[in-house]
Amino acid sequence: MSTPISDLIAFLTADTSDFNALGLWKYLILLLFYGLMAGSLWFAVANWREDPSQRTGANLWLWATRVAIGCMWFQGTLWKLPFGHENGLYYWTQQMAGRAAFAVHRDFVANVILPNFDLVNPFVYLAELGFATALVLGLLVRLAGTAAALFTLNLWLGIYDKRPGDPDEWPWSYVFLIFLCGTYAVLATGRALGADAWLRRNVAAVRDGRGPGALVRFVS
């Protein structure tokens, strides 16, 4: 019987079915996860030490929830691997071709996405890995949160309908994630013990909004 504790241990030791499907590559993916977590902790500690305004319970809460949702996105990347027609992404893309709320969406998936799935798969993986990285580190969160909300909107609409025999999905779970990621963007939660706060304080071009730093400041 699985429990939250046993499932957490299995994930942290790369001993889940999704991890094991990757063979020895799973250890590289696990190392990446630990690297992101170490980076998140480094930015949190640095911000806490350097900026008294960061030392609030609200910032701790925003940091913890942002990192948790980033971990969710990271875990979700695993079933996009290995690339090919045997992974979970291909199955759910097929589902979208028959379950999307609107005909134009169904037709686009059936006639464009599925025939070019081998090209689409890496882009979807990198997009979700980007969301995970941004949220765990608190990096460019206004941009990443907006993109993640729109990405999830596509998922919500894509499997909105349910045909006989289709697996059940709870649509509200996607709605909650849309609003949560959108909230991270609106509140710019990368400024709560994240890389965005560190960049806006320590990188002159970002702090002063000069040159390319102005764009970084806008999306952070």
Regions of interest found by a model, annotated:
Residues 1-100, 107-126, 137-220:
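Extended, low-polarity transmembrane helix blocks
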